Curated annotation (Swiss-Prot):
Subcellular location: Cell membrane
UniProt name for this protein: ATP synthase subunit alpha
InterPro entries: ATP_synth_asu-like_sf (IPR023366), ATP_synth_asu_C (IPR000793), ATP_synth_asu_C_sf (IPR038376), ATP_synth_F1_a_nt-bd_dom (IPR033732), ATP_synth_F1_asu (IPR005294), ATPase_a/bsu_AS (IPR020003), ATPase_F1/V1/A1_a/bsu_N (IPR004100), ATPase_F1/V1/A1_a/bsu_N_sf (IPR036121)
Entry binding sites for ATP: G169, D170, R171, Q172, T173, G174, K175, T176
GO cellular component, one term: plasma membrane
EC number: 7.1.2.2
Function: Produces ATP from ADP in the presence of a proton gradient across the membrane. The alpha chain is a regulatory subunit.
HAMAP family xrefs: ATP_synth_alpha_bact (MF_01346)
Quaternary structure note: F-type ATPases have 2 components, CF(1) - the catalytic core - and CF(0) - the membrane proton channel. CF(1) has five subunits: alpha(3), beta(3), gamma(1), delta(1), epsilon(1). CF(0) has three main subunits: a(1), b(2) and c(9-12). The alpha and beta chains form an alternating ring which encloses part of the gamma chain. CF(1) is attached to CF(0) by a central stalk formed by the gamma and epsilon chains, while a peripheral stalk is formed by the delta and b chains.
Record-level Gene Ontology MF annotations: ADP binding; ATP binding; proton-transporting ATP synthase activity, rotational mechanism
The species this protein was found in: Desulfitobacterium hafniense (strain DSM 10664 / DCB-2)
Length: 502
């Protein structure tokens, strides 16, 4: 092989020309302590609060405490693989999650990584988990209904698109069931649903995913899961990750429903992290900024103005109480942040009244303006009658001889309570709710025995769906009741009653 000197010199010249003298400067620190999802890192003097840090083995962390001589950071992954003395690099970025259409139908962890065994998620869009909530000028007041399919909610505590409505109650009172029913009811309504499971058993999350899949709801849903077996940092960031995924759709003019199940466990995880980071504890050992933990999350739910595409994100946070104590720290915080609350009671649940909603103390502060007119026309009277019934029922326990009007109100109230009962996974469209509640409010059920009310309702709805489908269609399109529609509804009720009572 002959090598000519001029050839060698030209190669050397090329190499000299290509030489790049740029030096990559990487800010590196050293792990001085690690454990329980927390690491303390020496160095990294220029690290920012909330910055993503890279540990060996592809594990990432997030800077939380910027102290004089070290940084306290939470580890987003297996902290057991990190050792003292390991090198940590700054990334110059903040924590982001993948977003977009590709996420729909998938089950992901708090970092947006798939955990459903269906392969990787093909998306090139990312959003930071922390984002500033839209300001007043970028919002529009809530005016469109978000139907849950549950009579007691849609009539008495209605929810609008862009609202934050808290679901609160003890364990085993059906909080998740209300949320899942609401997701199932969004089928065909062009609403993308996100279910964020925080600190739940993996088997419970699997059960919810199966239920959603069985009802065809995974076609428009994303499940973000941070189970009880995962480290506290994952439980802490999961709601923010779910919110970022929802914001991608909201800012593109779409409608989103997001459920945080539940924020009590997120607050407990944040308390754990804060105490491990040696932050000063406050009431119930929670850190001083636990209110901000939830307010900055829930304020991101909004109904956007037409200039920003008129998208919306409706949030249904769930809070678990202990023995019905809604005056505890976290429940009062979230009640004050949200636009209303749905109280679920153990006593009602055990008495067979499901969904176990206490309609007396449940409120919706903005949803009323989102109700369709037909529902407003029947629900106003329903709310009043139920309030009178509760008052009289408490009074009637002490005396037996009641006057006719009192007896009539008690009779009607019993039937109204019965008609508000509903089976799980059977959400009802709004026009059917209107005709059923119309029958109760106008006294058509007063002479039907209480134990026959549910079978009458089934018979009545069967007739409405088959022979009176045009009447339901009219209510759906006109969205209001007039004298003509009232007469048609009353005629239908009377016909069904005659056949039912025989």
């Amino acid at each position: 092989m002959n090598l000519r000197p001029e050839e060698i010199s030209s190669i050397i010249k090329q190499q000299i020309e290509r030489y790049d003298s740029a030096v990559e400067v990487v800010d590196v620190g050293t792990v001085i302590q690690v454990g329980d999802g927390i690491a303390r890192v020496h160095g990294l003097e220029k690290a920012m609060s909330g910055e993503l840090l890279e540990f060996p083995g592809g594990i990432y962390g997030m800077a939380m405490n910027l102290e004089e001589d070290n940084i306290g950071c939470i580890i987003l992954g297996k902290f057991t693989e990190i050792r003292e003395g390991d090198q940590v690099k700054r990334t110059g970025r903040i924590v982001e999650v993948p977003v977009g259409e590709a996420m729909i139908g998938r089950v992901v962890n708090a970092l947006g990584q798939p955990i459903d065994g269906k392969g990787e998620i093909k998306t090139d869009k990312f959003r930071p988990i922390e984002n500033i909530a839209p300001g007043v000028v970028y919002r529009k007041s809530v005016h469109e209904p978000l139907q849950t399919g549950l009579k007691s909610i849609d009539a008495i505590v209605p929810i609008g698109r862009g609202q934050r409505e808290l679901i609160i109650g003890d364990r085993q009172t059906g909080k998740t069931a209300v949320a899942v029913d609401t997701i199932i009811n969004q089928k065909g309504k062009d609403v993308i649903c996100i279910y964020v499971a925080v600190g739940q058993k993996a088997s419970t999350v699997a059960g919810v995913v199966k239920t959603l899949a069985d009802h065809g709801a995974m076609d428009y849903s994303i499940v973000v899961s941070a189970t009880a077996s995962e480290p506290a940092p994952m439980l802490y960031i999961a709601p923010y990750s779910g919110c970022a995924m929802g914001e991608e759709f909201m800012y593109n003019g779409k409608h989103v429903l997001i459920i945080y199940d539940d924020l009590t466990k997120q607050a407990a995880a944040y308390r754990e992290l804060s105490l491990l980071l040696k932050r000063p504890p406050g009431r119930e050992a929670y850190p001083g900024d636990v209110f901000y933990l939830h307010s900055r999350l829930l304020e991101r739910a909004a109904k956007l103005s037409p200039d920003l595409g008129s998208g919306s994100m409706t949030a249904l946070p769930i809070i678990e109480t202990q023995a019905g104590d809604v005056s505890a720290y976290i429940p009062t915080n979230v009640i004050s942040i949200t636009d209303g609350q749905i109280f679920l009671e153990t006593d009602l649940f055990n008495a067979g009244f499901r969904p176990a909603i206490n309609v007396g103390i449940s409120v919706s502060r903005v949803g009323g303006s989102a109700q369709i007119k037909a529902m407003k026309q029947v629900a106003g009277q329903l709310r009043l009658d139920l309030a009178q019934y509760r008052e009289l029922a408490a009074f009637a326990q002490f005396g037996s001889d009641l006057d006719k009007i009192t007896q009539m109100r008690l009779t009607r109230g019993e039937r109204m309570m019965e008609i508000l009962k509903q089976k799980q996974y059977e959400p009802m469209v709004v026009e059917e709710q209107v005709v059923v509640l119309y029958a109760a409010v106008k006294g058509f059920l007063d002479d039907i025995p209480v134990d026959k009310i549910k079978s009458f309702e089934e018979e009545y709805l069967r007739t409405m769906r088959t022979t009176k489908a045009d009447l339901l269609a009219k209510i759906r399109t006109e969205k209001a009741l007039n004298d003509e529609l009232n007469a048609e509804i009353e005629k239908a009720i009377t016909e069904v009653k005659e056949g039912f009572l025989g």
